[in-house]
Amino acid sequence: YMQYGNGRIVSHFFVMLFLTAPKIIFDVLNAFLFVFFIAFVLRITASKKSFSILLFFAVPTLFWLYMPAYGQVFLWLTGCINYMWSYLFALLFLNIYISLLRGKSLLDKKWKLISFCLFTFLFGNYSENVSFSVIFTGFLLMCVTMYQHKTIRKYLSYVFPIICGAAGYLVLLLSPSGSAKFSDNPVSY
């Protein structure tokens, strides 16, 4: 697939998987992930840990009102796997570095770090549009945290997920079909 399609191995794996499965499976999973996405938006942006039912309903309403092509991003199978799911994965990624900036280490065990490195490699390969900017933002948040605490050694383990994410992004970008976009003689099929 990387040779003739594109390098989005992870996202297009899910697209192909759910296109072959009964539609109800995708619909239920996507509804769950949408609720999880809204909850994560609230978690990252909220200054308090209290839950507001008003905000929980206001956020999706605002997405519905102000998101261009709402149906293509949140409802259409291919669109939501490529866009909404990538936004959710971006929030999961950034949550680690935002929590670190707020003084809470979420990668305190080795298995968590290894799992997060695997996740960031897959996330780096997920979407050209989202992956680079989010990984770079995570890097900047890590640098700000190191600067605030005047230490590098304590936060050095947080560099590994950034490297894994960059490696996943490079696999996406340097795939034969992906690199053809940047060549002087693009391949046409």
Regions found by a protein language model. Name each.
Residues 99-122:
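Short hydrophobic alpha-helices at membrane interfaces in multi-pass membrane enzymes
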Residues 42-52, 101-109, 145-156:
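Membrane-interface helix-boundary motifs at transmembrane edges
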Residues 39-43, 92-99, 137-146:
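Transmembrane alpha-helices and membrane-interface helical segments
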Residues 1-24, 28, 77, 111, ...:
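Transmembrane catalytic cores of multi-pass membrane glycosyltransferases
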Residues 28-36, 80-93, 135-136:
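Membrane-embedded alpha-helical segments of multi-pass membrane proteins
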Residues 31-54, 92:
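Transmembrane-helix motifs of polytopic, lipid-linked glycan transferases
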Residues 8, 55-98, 127:
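Membrane-interface micro-motifs in multi-pass membrane enzymes
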